């Protein structure tokens, strides 16, 4: 723009001068749409035809009709006004439909008539049309061609820049107007200028404009006031915005919506709804009932706070006010339901919406992506791409879909998406290119990640962060450290995101030395002030097991955020200290810190690891007291916690009580049934899940396979493994194969299990799979295979005592005592010790522990006495000590005596002594329950008429009336 503009201080002087002048600078010739004579039937009919054509979108027919009426410049005044009004309707329709080609045809038609092109009203309409079509340069061209410019035309061009978010140009034009003309801004000018100030980082300019508003006496104007409220809210000055709102002499619905949005955007969720209630209470006559803009403003609050109840209430208002057909509102509702974990509700709205736009599709793609549902994400995406030319995917679509490809099994889908993006030239967008770099790295396709990265013309810190972050989350995080060195060579310095990725890589590598180097760089460059960086440092030391350092860093934090508390709780949990994790939780409660759903997840996780159903119930009570029970994360954690504490009935109650079931909640319940060996229930729930429209994911199949494994359903387990691959396109991981191999091995199909390892698995078998095979070799006394598997285990984990114990037990079962002695001698030479069997039971808010063979504990004589009675009773029912469970070369009498000292028997007997009749006994054991204790517990449950629940390190056993839930298959 070639113009010499005055700085703002001089502009103030000009304003003072102009306001002292008597004459008004405002033009008086205002266009009046009623200027056509009302008794002109033909004229009215003509305008109705034009209006109808515009409403139906038939702009070509409308244009041809108007074109016939454009005559010479000497036509009558009435005819001229008629044509002008018709052209105005057509220009407005072209702008609404963003039909710039039609707009240009009209512009050309107007330019051909001297009288039309000199008409102020039409010129203003043309400027506005180009603005609506997203072409502010054309608006400016028309404006600059005007010989004389009135305020409406200045407002139109300022509005054009504002509408298209060219905020620098807005201010330049505004200053040009007040510097070079005698015109004073009005209540149409200022809202556009103030909006521009809101979109700029320099708050001072907005404050200066506010000063001009005060000088011109427009501060009490409702339109200007609304703009100022939004300006202060956008820059985070919530108190100032509220003060302006409170002193407004007149408020319209936009005023209320603006203030509600200020609260919403600045995280004042409760205040948003309180103000909404105040708006409706003050105007009970319906004058200010919520409109689409109101509801669209409060829905993100519901999503952010995961307040599904409030979200449904807003949805109810939409239906009641008959706004539920509005596209923008439906899109907001879909977004809210998706972010609250209710993807099914979002799908229902999506399917019922016949007028979908790209935002609708993007919302659904993003919803499935946020759930980690790759199958659902690509289903919606393919439907969108198959829809023809009506709706086209854009960069946002790709950015929503790409993150869901985070594993090598999703590489084909990622490549498919990449091809489409290349064809549409989306990859030239830096954000899209960065997303592909990160996802290719996460999927392990480093060559593709590098190829996309090198294709970025101008690499920024963000580009390097995408590569470094992707490598950090890949199977080889060392590559992120190499990329960091290349970044430094290129002359770019790491930022907060870079160091967070590097810390993540060090955490995965458990490299304390490298992590400390990164921490040193952070301290030297004052990056510790960034909360995310500080939390990443905490996470590093947590992964490296440096809990003293974690506690010291946490204690040094002046302002402890909720996330920092959660990080420390999770850290103790990950390092096997659930009691300390609960101690931190108690501190939070004492300090009055309000926990959210996500915060409670590690608390329930800690309760799952401790032998205390009581603690879990207390945590549940806390969630109920603070109205967190409807949170999707809480629901899943509760289901999991009760299942792992042996109360599968309570898990089922929580699940069945959910109003909205997410994929995660289905998975938690299926896995709960799985670890309890309730295969029929797990399979039934799996089928019901699919009927309700939820797509199973890899965790769903893990739960089903676990259930089949614990129940010995080999045929069904293999069928579900095949279905996972063929029907759902999911690639089994090591956990899935571990279930299948354990299932085959315990059924005696050892050769088949070994073939699965050798032929079907794309990854190298981990120690868990080899341990499972060795355990199966022990059960079925397959010495040859057992020794080969043990050799593999010793190669992978040479210092794990349980590997030697498994081999020793195999030899003992075959009576090869000399080999047993050699294995134990080798363990002694390596200073390896077998974990002693230990069991726990909670009684009267205390946890009692029992170690195998322990004879010096309080109440031992009482335990010994009751066990003698119990042994006598169950012997009459057929109990015979299973001395094969003793892995030592002893006499039969010595073996029987050793069986009596097993920790689960001690805990069970003590529980019977200390509890009243009919009470369920819950025992927790660190190792797998032996055959002898299993047989004894079954018969004791019948003799004593008690339900006994034993959780060992593999699964749950529910003993009742002489029967175990595992069906003697474990």
Swiss-Prot record:
Q: Where is this region: Type DYW motif?
A: 876-970
**GO molecular function ontology, one term from the record:** mRNA binding
Q: Where is this region: Type E(+) motif?
A: 846-875
Q: Where are the PPR repeats?
A: 119-149, 150-185, 186-220, 221-251, 252-282, 291-325, 326-356, 357-391, 394-428, 429-459, 460-494, 495-529, 530-560, 561-595, 597-630, 631-661, 662-696, 697-727, 733-764
Instruction: Return the protein name.
Output: Pentatricopeptide repeat-containing protein At1g18485
Matching Pfam families: DYW_deaminase, E_motif, PPR, PPR_2
UniProt-listed PROSITE patterns: PPR
Give the NCBIfam families listed for this entry.
Answer: PPR
Map out region (Type E motif) in residue numbers: 770-845
Q: Which family does the entry's similarity section mention?
A: Belongs to the PPR family. PCMP-H subfamily.
User: Keyword Repeat: yes or no?
Assistant: yes
Q: State the UniProt keywords alphabetically.
A: Repeat
Could you tell me which Gene3D superfamilies the record lists for this protein?
A: Tetratricopeptide repeat domain
Q: Which superkingdom, per the lineage?
A: Eukaryota
Which species is the source of this protein? Arabidopsis thaliana (Mouse-ear cress)
Under the heading SUPFAM superfamilies, the entry gives: TPR-like
């Amino acid at each position: 723009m070639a113009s010499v503009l005055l700085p703002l201080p001089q502009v103030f002087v000009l304003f003072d001068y102009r306001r002292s002048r008597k004459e008004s600078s405002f033009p008086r010739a205002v266009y009046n749409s009623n200027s056509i004579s009302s008794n002109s039937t033909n004229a009215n009919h003509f305008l109705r035809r034009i209006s109808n054509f515009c409403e139906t979108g038939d702009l070509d027919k409308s244009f041809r009709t108007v074109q016939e009426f454009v005559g010479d410049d000497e036509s009558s005044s009435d005819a001229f006004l008629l044509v002008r009004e018709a052209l105005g309707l057509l220009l407005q329709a072209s702008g609404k439909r963003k039909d710039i080609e039609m707009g240009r045809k009209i512009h050309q038609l107007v330019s051909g008539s001297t009288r039309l092109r000199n008409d102020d009203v039409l010129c203003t309409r043309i400027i506005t049309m180009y603005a609506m079509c997203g072409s502010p340069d054309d608006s400016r061209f028309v404006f600059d061609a005007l010989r004389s410019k009135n305020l409406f035309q200045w407002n139109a061009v300022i509005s054009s820049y504002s509408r298209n978010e060219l905020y620098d140009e807005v201010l330049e034009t505004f200053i040009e107007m007040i510097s070079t003309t005698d015109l004073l801004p009005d209540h149409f000018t200022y809202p556009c200028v103030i909006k521009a100030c809101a979109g700029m980082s320099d708050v001072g300019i907005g404050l200066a404009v506010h000063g001009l508003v005060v000088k011109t006496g427009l501060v009490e104007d409702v339109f200007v006031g609304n703009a100022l409220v939004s300006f202060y809210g956008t820059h985070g000055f919530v108190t100032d915005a509220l003060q302006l709102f409170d002193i407004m002499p007149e408020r319209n619905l936009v005023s209320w919506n603006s203030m509600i949005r200020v609260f919403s955007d600045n995280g004042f969720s409760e205040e948003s709804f309180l103000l909404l209630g105040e708006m409706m209470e003050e105007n009970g006559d319906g004058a200010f009932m919520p409109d689409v803009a109101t509801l669209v403003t409060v829905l993100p609050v519901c999503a952010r706070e995961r307040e599904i109840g409030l979200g449904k209430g807003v949805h109810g208002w939409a239906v009641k006010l008959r706004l539920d057909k509005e596209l923008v509102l439906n899109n907001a509702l879909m977004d809210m339901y998706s972010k609250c974990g209710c993807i099914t509700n979002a799908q229902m709205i999506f399917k019922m919406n016949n007028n979908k736009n790209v935002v609708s599709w993007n919302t659904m793609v993003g919803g499935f992506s946020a759930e980690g549902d790759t199958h659902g994400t690509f289903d919606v995406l393919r439907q969108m791409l198959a829809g023809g030319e009506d709706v086209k995917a854009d960069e946002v679509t790709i950015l929503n879909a790409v993150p869901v490809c985070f594993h090598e099994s999703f590489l084909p889908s990622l490549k498919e998406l990449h091809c489409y993006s290349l064809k549409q030239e989306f990859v030239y967008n830096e954000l899209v290119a960065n997303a592909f770099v990160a996802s290719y790295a996460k999927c392990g396709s480093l060559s593709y990640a590098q190829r996309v990265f090198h294709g970025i013309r101008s690499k920024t810190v963000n580009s390097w962060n995408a590569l470094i972050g992707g490598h950090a989350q890949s199977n080889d995080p060392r590559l992120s450290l190499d990329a960091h060195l290349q970044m430094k060579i290129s002359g770019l310095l790491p930022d907060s995101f870079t160091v967070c990725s590097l810390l993540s890589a060090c955490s995965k590598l458990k490299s304390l030395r490298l992590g400390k180097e990164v921490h040193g760089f952070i301290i030297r460059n004052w990056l510790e002030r960034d909360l995310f960086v500080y939390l990443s440092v905490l996470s590093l030391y947590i992964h490296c097991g440096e809990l003293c350092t974690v506690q010291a860093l946490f204690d040094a934090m002046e302002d402890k955020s909720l996330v920092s508390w959660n990080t420390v709780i999770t850290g103790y949990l990950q390092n096997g200290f659930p009691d300390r994790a609960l101690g931190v939780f108690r501190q939070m409660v004492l300090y009055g810190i309000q926990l959210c759903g996500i915060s409670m997840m590690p608390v329930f996780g800690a309760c799952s690891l401790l032998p205390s159903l009581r603690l879990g119930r207390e945590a549940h009570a806390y969630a109920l007291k603070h109205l967190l029970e409807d949170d999707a994360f809480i629901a899943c954690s509760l289901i999991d916690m009760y299942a792992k504490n042996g109360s599968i009935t309570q898990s089922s109650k929580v699940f069945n009580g959910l109003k909205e079931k997410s994929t995660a909640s289905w998975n938690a319940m299926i896995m709960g049934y799985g670890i309890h060996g309730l295969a029929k229930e797990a399979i039934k729930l799996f089928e019901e899940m699919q009927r309700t429209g939820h797509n199973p994911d890899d965790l769903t199949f893990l739960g089903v396979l676990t259930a089949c494994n614990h129940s010995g359903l080999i045929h069904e387990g293999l069928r579900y493994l095949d279905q996972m691959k063929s029907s759902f396109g999911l690639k089994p991981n090591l956990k899935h194969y571990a279930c299948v191999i354990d299932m085959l091995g315990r059924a005696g199909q050892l050769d088949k299990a070994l073939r699965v390892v050798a032929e079907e698995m794309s990854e190298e078998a981990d120690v868990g799979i080899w341990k499972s095979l060795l355990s199966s070799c022990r059960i079925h006394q397959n010495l040859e295979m057992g020794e080969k598997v043990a050799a593999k285990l010793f190669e992978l984990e040479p210092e794990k005592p349980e590997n030697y114990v498994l081999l020793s037990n195999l030899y003992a079962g075959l009576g090869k005592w000399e080999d047993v002695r050699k294995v134990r001698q080798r363990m002694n030479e390596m200073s390896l010790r077998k974990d002693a069997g230990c069991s726990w039971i909670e009684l009267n808010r205390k946890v009692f522990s029992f170690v195998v063979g322990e004879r010096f504990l309080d109440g031992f004589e009482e335990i010994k006495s009751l066990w003698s009675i119990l042994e006598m009773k169950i012997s009459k029912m057929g109990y015979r000590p299973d001395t094969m469970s003793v892995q030592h070369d002893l006499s039969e009498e010595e073996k029987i005596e050793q069986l009596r000292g097993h920790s689960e028997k001690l805990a069970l007997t003590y529980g019977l002594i200390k509890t009243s009749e009919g009470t369920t006994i819950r025992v927790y054991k660190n190792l797998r329950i032996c055959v002898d204790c299993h047989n004894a517990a079954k018969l004791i449950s019948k003799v004593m008429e008690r339900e006994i629940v034993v959780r060992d390190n593999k699964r749950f056993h529910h003993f009742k009336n002489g029967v175990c839930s595992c069906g003697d298959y474990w």
